[in-house]
Amino acid sequence: LNDHLSFNFDKFVPNQNNILFQGEASVSTTGVLQVTKVSKPATRSIGRALYAAPVHIWDSTTGRVASFETSFSFVVKDEPEKSNGVDGLTFFLAPANSQIPSGSSAGLFGLFNSSDNKSSNQIIAVEFDTYFGKTYNPWDPDFKHIGVDVNSIKSIKTVKWDWRNGEVANVVITYRAPTKSLTVSLSYPSDQTSNIVTASVDLKAILPEWVSVGFSAGVGNAAEFETHDVLSWYFTSNLEANPA
């Protein structure tokens, strides 16, 4: 069994053979991973893109748990420019061979089909959420945000996201198994500041031993139009030695 996995996409190619495409995710001729539809109308568009090989995230025989790091660049672009945003992008870990649940469009990001916090979901996600509004998304804070989601669309931890429409965002997500610490950092090259959120997450208690990793995004039922494009993606994971 492979206890270590690393891959790196500087760019993508159409019909990339080591990416599983679900819903309306695709790769453009220019090498961009487009997680949702890029042409109007995109109402209720939903997509996911997963690395084809499963990741060994913990081992029941030894009790070992993986530490991982992933970095990626993405662009979320809205039209018209002053729109509210609909709805956002996630990086997530879910059971291997996971599919898009029915009823999971818009602010449920193709991950959940309700706001229920069910342990059977077996999902950890980092959401980059451009839409907030108590009418449709009562679980959200009152600002655009980065959130850590555990089995539920209601984040266990959020931080305000200074979203820049159409700008490239650089993200680094690290998970340290010994401390059960998940840290997310997002920055824009045009700016020296970062939006950072850290949460305590026990992978072994939430996820199955083998998971799929990737991106998901959803567009709501609105006049606004939003695209969710991933430009590059690096991931590495390693099962740690036995805990003392």
From Swiss-Prot:
Sorted UniProt keywords: Calcium, Glycoprotein, Lectin, Manganese, Metal-binding
The keyword Glycoprotein is assigned to this record: yes
Gene3D superfamilies given in the database record: 2.60.120.200
SUPFAM superfamilies linked: Concanavalin A-like lectins/glucanases
Binding locations of Mn(2+): E127, D129, D142, H145
CDD domains the UniProt entry points to: lectin_legume_LecRK_Arcelin_ConA
Record bears the keyword Glycoprotein: yes
Residues bound to Ca(2+): D129, Y131, N137, D142
Superkingdom in the source lineage: Eukaryota
Record: glycosylation sites: N113, N117
GO molecular function: carbohydrate binding; metal ion binding
InterPro entries, per database record: ConA-like_dom_sf (IPR013320), L-lectin (IPR016363), Lectin_LegA_CS (IPR000985), Lectin_legB_Mn/Ca_BS (IPR019825), Legume_lectin_dom (IPR001220), Leguminous_Lectin (IPR050258)
Domain notes: The peptide 129-Asp--Trp-139 is responsible for the carbohydrate binding.
Subunit structure: Homotetramer.
Family the UniProt entry places it in: Belongs to the leguminous lectin family.
Function per UniProt: Di-N-acetylchitobiose-binding anti-H(O) lectin.
Name of the featured protein: Anti-H(O) lectin 1
Organism: Cytisophyllum sessilifolium (Sessile-leaved cytisus)
